[in-house]
Amino acid sequence: MRHGKSGRKLNRTTSHRKAMFANMAASLIEHEQIVTTLPKAKEIRPIVEKLVTLGKRGDLHARRQAIAAIRDTEKVAKLFSALAPRYESRHGGYLRIMKAGFRTGDNAPMAVVEFVDRDVNAKGATDHERKVAKVTEKEDS
């Protein structure tokens, strides 16, 4: 019987699932918006919302718990310095999940996960810089 069992397995082992959620949380904190499948989006929401709550707490123990969860000190620094002050007056509900149609190929339901009051410049800025650097590198060769 599955009484009291919560969460989806997503056809992955426990360690793979934990690593995937850590990577997704880090990407969401960095870019403030990600596109993923709807079941993954529904699973990542409570994880990231708890991380933002840790950021709002702001003490050393909360910082260490956040580092243990996502394993990226740069993202944790952004969480505590940029995201936590932004959501200081908001009690939960930091993320928005919007359905984004179906993926070509396997028809999987897709979703956009984003922070409610996100910085629109956070998404794509580093990606654009990386792309420009790659293009100039190809032209130089």
Curated annotation (Swiss-Prot):
InterPro entries: Ribosomal_bL17, Ribosomal_bL17_CS, Ribosomal_bL17_sf. GO terms for biological process: translation. Keywords: Ribonucleoprotein, Ribosomal protein. It comes from the Bacteria. One of its GO terms (cellular component) is cytosolic large ribosomal subunit. The keyword Transmembrane does not apply. Disulfide bonds: none annotated. One of its GO terms (molecular function) is structural constituent of ribosome. Part of the 50S ribosomal subunit. Contacts protein L32. Belongs to the bacterial ribosomal protein bL17 family. HAMAP family: Ribosomal_bL17 (MF_01368). This is Large ribosomal subunit protein bL17. It comes from Bartonella bacilliformis (strain ATCC 35685 / KC583 / Herrer 020/F12,63). The lineage of its organism: Bacteria, Pseudomonadati, Pseudomonadota, Alphaproteobacteria, Hyphomicrobiales.
